[in-house]
Amino acid sequence: MAVVSTSLASQITNPNSAVSTQFSGLRRSFLKLENSVSTQSSFFQNVDSHLRLSSSSRRCPRGVVAMAGSGKFFVGGNWKCNGTKESITKLVSDLNSATLEADVDVVVAPPFVYIDQVKSSLTGRVEISAQNCWIGKGGAFTGEISVEQLKDLGCQWVILGHSERRHVIGEQNEFIGKKAAYALNQGVGVIACIGELLEEREAGKTFDVCYQQLKAFADALPSWDNVVVAYEPVWAIGTGKVASPDQAQEVHVAVRDWLKKNVSEEVASKTRIIYGGSVNGGNCAELAKQEDIDGFLVGGASLKGPEFATIVNSVTAKKVAA
């Protein structure tokens, strides 16, 4: 196949544009929106046959929507490209000794090379996620990791659509959606990331960008069972800046409303929508109090066992607020 012959540089060369709806606050207007990440459609034409083989032939009818999870608070730790065998041994030891609230689904996403080490040494109920996966079955795709390989290592989840994959690697909405569909069809849960750039927020395009990203997932997914949506404003990731509780809640409400109108009311009410973007032990409680924030996707703070435990246990703030 010609999939791997297209360079990442060529994927991010020429801007495409799309006609869509812009939201400023909650008011709607129509405009022509230029994509913030310029990509070439040829990349997706090259993989189109692979998409059809790996996803479309296995899709359930769009009218069939399976309900998502348990409704528990959900906290994921994205370790990104960090750690050594020694530091991860210490981090896992801290997690094993931490007291974590029972009413929380806890997931950690180590780098690929440490998944087996983490899986074999965790003693509690913490589940394992991958940070990415290939769009279909394994084969001649140098450097990629298949969902089947992740399952073989014991991964229950995979993070897809993270802003660093979108804006650094150049992955497009359609490509991400197809990866999510394949993972779900293989029985791996998806943490589906969405979020806007700073210039998009300042231009009043926050909702529009998030809706486009959601639509790409909705168009591809066989169901919303085992899907967690993670809203991560790009301007807040790793910057120390964090959306205020009100800002985060506003977007979470809008995301849930979009799911209600475009997927189903049941999916909207069942799907957990979590927040990510410089979440730490100091701000997690106030964020957790927001009605539509169902948990967190944590970056840097997840590399510190005690602080990550504090974030997991912020579910108590939600219980008090309720």
Curated annotation (Swiss-Prot):
It is found in: Plastid, Chloroplast. It catalyses: D-glyceraldehyde 3-phosphate = dihydroxyacetone phosphate. Substrate binds at N78, K80. It is an enzyme of class 5 (isomerase). The keyword Transit peptide applies. GO terms for biological process: gluconeogenesis; glyceraldehyde-3-phosphate biosynthetic process; glycerol catabolic process; glycolytic process; reductive pentose-phosphate cycle. Residues 1-67 form a transit peptide. Keywords: Calvin cycle, Chloroplast, Isomerase, Plastid, Transit peptide. Its EC number is 5.3.1.1. One of its GO terms (cellular component) is chloroplast. Pathway: Carbohydrate biosynthesis; Calvin cycle. In plants, there are two types of TPIS, cytosolic and plastid. Homodimer. This is Triosephosphate isomerase, chloroplastic. It comes from Spinacia oleracea (Spinach). The lineage of its organism: Eukaryota, Viridiplantae, Streptophyta, Embryophyta, Tracheophyta. The gene is TPIP1.
